[in-house]
């Protein structure tokens, strides 16, 4: 965890990996509070209490930093989805599987609503070969849920093929609108969120087999 004592450390007091983690954590917090456009390498050096040279040892340029902060943002998303999933019954029934599917979809939308600045950066750069896969992975959570629905007979083999793209697109699109404040007040957004999630079920013909 990044603490005030960590922020006061000199360059030499950081282990190589520790400084990189501290920089990404500081960048993540900065973006969440102030937005993507204010993120900068020199500003990050000031916040973490190290020299600009130390920052450049880890991030060659601003785009490199943004890529790492984007990955960290996606991990926040994955954790939100996993936390929501863990609050739902683990019953191996069709209703349980549908509830879990709705839980991760709802958490994805909540990420856009509650952490709009992180949503903005999360998917702007995610194809760098230097990055390890995110953990937990929001994509893996989606695929696991869809496969479970298919195994329980709630989702047909035919629809399973297109389900990932359709489900992701619908939820991601609404989350993006919510992140921009384009879905009305909190009550209107919540109502629309429920409609979108039910629309995903209908579009994919996901049914409770009882």
Model-identified regions with their sequence ranges:
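Hydrophobic alpha-helical connector segments
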Residues: 82-115, 167
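Helix-turn-helix
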Residues: 22, 26, 30-64, 68
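N-terminal intrinsically disordered/low-complexity leader segments
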Residues: 1-18, 88, 208-210
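Alpha-helical DNA-contacting segments of helix-turn-helix folds
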Residues: 31, 66-73, 80, 122, ...
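Short secondary-structure transition hinges
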Residues: 110-144, 183-186, 190
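An amphipathic alpha-helix signature
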Residues: 98, 102, 106, 139, ...
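Hydrophobic/aromatic-rich alpha-helical bundle segments in the mid-to-C-terminal region
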Residues: 131-132, 136, 149-199, 208-210
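Generic hydrophobic, amphipathic alpha-helix propensity
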Residues: 19-28, 44, 69-73, 77, ...
């Amino acid at each position: 965890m990044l603490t005030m004592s960590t922020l006061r450390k000199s360059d030499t007091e950081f282990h190589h990996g520790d400084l990189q983690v501290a920089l990404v954590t500081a960048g993540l917090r900065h973006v969440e509070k102030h937005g993507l456009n204010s993120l900068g390498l020199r500003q990050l050096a000031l916040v973490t209490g190290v020299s600009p040279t130390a920052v450049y040892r880890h991030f060659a340029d601003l785009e490199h930093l943004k890529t790492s902060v984007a990955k960290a943002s996606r991990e926040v998303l994955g954790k939100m989805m996993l936390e929501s999933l863990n609050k739902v019954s683990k019953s191996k029934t069709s209703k349980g599987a549908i509830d879990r599917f709705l839980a991760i979809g709802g958490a994805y939308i909540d990420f856009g609503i509650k952490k709009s600045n992180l949503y903005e950066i999360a998917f702007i750069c995610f194809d760098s070969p230097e990055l390890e896969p995110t953990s937990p992975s929001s994509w893996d959570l989606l695929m696991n849920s869809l496969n479970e629905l298919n195994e329980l007979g709630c989702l047909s083999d035919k629809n399973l093929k297109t389900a990932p793209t359709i489900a992701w697109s619908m939820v991601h699109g609404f989350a993006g609108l919510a992140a921009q404040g384009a879905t009305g007040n909190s009550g209107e957004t919540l109502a629309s969120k429920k409609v979108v999630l039910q629309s995903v079920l209908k579009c994919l013909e996901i049914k409770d087999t009882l």
